[in-house]
Regions:
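Dynamic helix-loop-helix/coil hinge segments at AAA+ ATPase domain boundaries and subdomain interfaces
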Residues: 20-38
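Pre-Walker A adenine-sensing motif
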Residues: 39-51
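Walker A/P-loop nucleotide-binding motif
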Residues: 51-73
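Conserved NTP-binding/hydrolysis module of P-loop NTPases
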Residues: 93-94, 99-120
């Protein structure tokens, strides 16, 4: 089992099929070059000196192409802690999800809920804003992450402008970098405010292509799949098939390998083959709408 990471070999030998299947379903972070570059940039933001104009980062990618997983990886590396000298809670990185539509009150509530602070329905919006600013300063938040920022576009033009002004005001008051993330619509959302757009550096997670980085990604995946035989995922027929099925989205690649690993365990073949890939219960992203039409749903 030379294809398996050393810390996984003992687990595979001593575990039942059910235990290995359960392990397969657990999320595993698979690093890759572009993710490392973006993570390094975000780490740099946590130590950036406070100044007149703080740098911001905009993470753009298609749905299921690794944006949220990357952000959560960053958050896990910068968890809240209690300062031993002051006995106060510190939260260097705070991540929230943008509300489904641009709404100032719901935005503040998302922040308050994330730090387990109470929310009051009757509280005036300016008081809520002041409380958010006070709490984030007390927690010494270094970077604020707003995921699904493209939700801004779900509102009217006036609501979009108001919401973006709220974000801009919060950033100015706290004097900290922002990281916003979303689909390609996120870029359009930020571009509606010229001042904000100039502050954000866009970083794009593109679809995977059949190149060295993609083969390296598959090799990394194979090291954490709890099956006993080498599948050699980087072999052309397998790698091409996985890329075609996944439509180049890392979330889909992960799901395909999860389903294939489970089938390989259940059939005792203990390796991923073309037959296994053809047998898994999976519909490629580009074929899902077609499947609805074919089944008379539309």
């Amino acid at each position: 089992m030379e294809h398996i990471a050393d810390n996984l070999k003992t687990f595979i030998v001593n575990s039942s099929s059910e235990e290995r299947i359960l392990y397969t379903k657990e999320f595993k972070w698979i690093g890759y070059t572009k993710a490392k570059i973006i993570l390094d940039k975000m780490v740099d933001l946590t130590t950036y000196p406070k100044g007149h104009r703080m740098p911001n980062l905009l993470l753009v990618g298609e749905s299921n192409n690794g944006k949220t997983a990357l952000l959560k990886k960053f958050c896990r590396s910068h968890q809240s802690y209690v300062d031993e000298k002051t006995a106060k809670l510190k939260c260097p990185v705070l991540m929230i999800q943008s509300p489904p539509e641009p709404d100032e009150k719901r935005f503040y509530n998302a922040i308050l809920n994330s730090v387990l602070a109470p929310t009051k329905t009757s509280e005036k919006i300016e008081n809520r804003q002041n409380r958010v600013i006070h709490l984030l300063k007390e927690l010494e938040v270094k970077v604020l992450i707003i995921d699904e920022i493209h939700h801004v576009l779900a509102g009217t033009i006036s609501k979009q402008r108001l919401f973006l002004n709220v974000i801009k005001y919060l950033s100015n008051e706290l004097n900290i970098p922002l990281v916003c993330s979303g689909t390609k619509l996120a870029f359009n959302a930020i571009q509606t405010d010229s001042q904000l757009s100039n502050r954000f550096e866009p970083n794009i997670l593109v679809r995977w292509e059949n190149n060295t980085d993609y083969k390296r990604l598959l090799a990394s995946f194979e090291k954490v799949l709890p099956i006993k035989k080498r599948s050699n995922l980087i072999e052309d027929k397998l790698s091409n098939k996985i890329l075609l099925m996944s439509d180049g989205l890392i979330g889909e690649i992960s799901k395909i390998l999860e389903l294939s690993t489970i089938l390989a365990i259940n059939t005792t073949s203990e390796k991923i083959t073309l037959d296994i890939l053809n047998e898994i219960d999976y519909i490629a992203p580009q074929n899902r709408k077609k499947a609805f039409f074919n089944n008379g749903i539309y």
